[in-house]
């Protein structure tokens, strides 16, 4: 079992940094052109899945594969654990990353299913202090278009996205708050969280 010291203050620090203080592997520069191509590929696959007419279960499986190919899941998983990462063993971190990949792909896959009948259109790029932001617009039936931003970096020898901001909601910050709340609800037992997270 892992103790949970000062979780509220830790979350506050994460919010203050705006999600920029990621942990994990070193980061190399990624060009705007490479980041744009990466997100264009991601968006093309997402659009193909939402237009496929498959069942929800089939779509969620497809979205898990998309996250595998396009997201820096280890970096995201390490960030959302916050200081709990320091107390976890290597085996726990590996197991959590695997469980979190399924959880986040299903969660955002369900969000992307809301785009059925519409599409995501890439509109531009800009360089950030860390990585590149690729901006897109989600054009859906029956509602006003809204912005979706992808933050892309090269931390594993190729471009990968490490954050998504949908209608102003920052994935890294909201996921850290949610994962730490889930861990609290399980008495700080990381192994229990790992076992239950894919079904959450």
Predicted regions and their residues:
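Short beta-strand edge/turn micro-motifs at domain boundaries
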Residues: 145-147, 151-173
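N-terminal secretory signal peptides and thylakoid transit peptides that target proteins
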Residues: 1-18
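Early exported N-terminus immediately downstream of N-terminal targeting peptides
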Residues: 32-108
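Boundary at the C-terminal end of the N-terminal hydrophobic targeting segment
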Residues: 27-31
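Surface-exposed, polar/charged faces of alpha-helical domains
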Residues: 55, 90-91, 117, 188, ...
